[in-house]
Amino acid sequence: MERSQLYLSTIDPEAGNIARAQGLGVEIADFCTACNADELFDETNRRVLAQTRGIARRVLHGPFNELFPCAIDPLARKLAAYRYAQALELARRYGAQKLVLHGGYCPRLYFPCWYVEQSVAFWREFLAQHPGAYEICLENVMEEAPEMLLSIVRQVADPRLCLCLDVGHVNSYSGIPAIEWMAQYGPWLSHLHLHNNDASADTHSPLPRGSLPMA
C-alpha cells in the first residue's frame, strides 16, 4: 500500500508529528465523542489544528455514541441526523475529503431487516437534505456479515455514500473472514481501518498483535 493511501488516527497524540515525518495523512478522531463539538470545541479545535498542521490529506471520523440511524424513536433518529450534519460541517471546516460514520447496527436492539430498511430511508433523506460534494463512508462495527451495509449503499445508490471496512471489528464480531468482506465490498470500498485483536474483544491492538495475519 502506498503512503498516499495511509492515514494515522489522531487517537494517538503523536499522529500529526509522525504523519508529517512520514508523508502520511491523518484521520481526525477527536470528534468521535460528540461533546468535543459542543462545550469542548475550543480546546478540541486547538488540538485538531495542531495535529493537522501541514497535512493535506485528511479524513474525519464522526461521533457514534448513542447514534442509531435506524432508531425506532423518531427523536433518536433526529439526534443521529443532527450529529451527522454537525460532523459534515466539521469535515468541511478541516478540509477532510471523507467522513467516516458507524453504520449503527446493534444486534440486541434491531433485526437485520429493520436495520437495513430504515437505514436506507434515513440516508436517502439525509443526502437529499444535504446537497454538495462530499463522501460518507459507513463503517462496520457489530454487523455480522458484509451484506448488511452493502445492501444499504446499493439501495441508496448515491455516489456520496460508500463503505469503510474495519478489519478489527470484523475479527471481533463476524465469523466471515475480512478478505471476504473486502471482496464483497468491491467498488463501494473507499476506506480501511487497520488494527488487530485476538477475536475475543475489540482491543484496537497494533497490527502484529492479534489473530489477523497482518505482521
What is the predicted role of each segment?
Residues 1-86:
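N-terminal pre-domain/capping segments
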Residues 2-10, 24-28, 58-62, 99-101, ...:
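Hydrophobic faces of well-ordered beta-strands that scaffold small-molecule active sites
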Residues 66-72, 106-111, 172-173, 200-204:
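A short acidic, helix-capping loop that chelates divalent metal ions and anchors anionic groups
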Residues 15-23, 40-60, 85-95, 127-131, ...:
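Acidic (Asp/Glu)-rich catalytic clusters
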Residues 9-13, 29-33, 63-65, 104-106, ...:
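Active-site beta-loop-alpha junctions enriched in small/polar residues
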Residues 40-46, 76-85, 113-123, 150, ...:
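Charged helix-capping and loop-helix junction motifs
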Residues 125-208:
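Acidic/histidine-rich catalytic cores of soluble enzymes
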Residues 70-162:
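Active-site acidic/histidine proton-transfer and metal-coordination neighborhood
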